[in-house]
Amino acid sequence: MAVTARNQRVAEEMKKEIARIIRDEVKDPRLEAGLVSVTGVELSNDRHYAKVYVSIYGDEEARNQAMEGLARATSFIRREIGQRLSLRYTPEITFKLDVSIEHGDHINRLLARVRAGEYADE
């Protein structure tokens, strides 16, 4: 799937706007339990579908609650995106949990343990 320059620009604008909407306008207490960061947006070639990757700081319960809150707010967020960005078609939004930051942190901790001489398997 080739990513066009237009899709990249639209995805970046969507990322910024969705982050603003979640931070400033969505009033769901489930989203306040964990810190939600939008890490990326992946658009389909026809720009009808968008996968929004989010990183949620907190324990497993906070992540689950935040994902439920995002699922409930999806139609509101989509409507706001449609009003703020001049797109022919407002993409259907799907939120996906991005665990790459946590995975990278785990790798860094393991490397630090190896450097410190702790060779225990994990």
UniProtKB/Swiss-Prot annotation:
One term under GO cellular component: cytosol
Annotated InterPro entries: KH_dom-like_a/b, RbfA, RbfA_dom_sf, Ribosome-bd_factorA_CS
Cellular compartments annotated: Cytoplasm
Pfam family, one: RBFA
Recorded superkingdom: Bacteria
Claim: Cytoplasm is one of the keywords in the record: yes
Gene Ontology biological process terms, A to Z: maturation of SSU-rRNA
Subunit note: Monomer. Binds 30S ribosomal subunits, but not 50S ribosomal subunits or 70S ribosomes.
UniProt xrefs under HAMAP family: RbfA
Protein name per Swiss-Prot or TrEMBL: Ribosome-binding factor A
This protein's encoding gene: rbfA
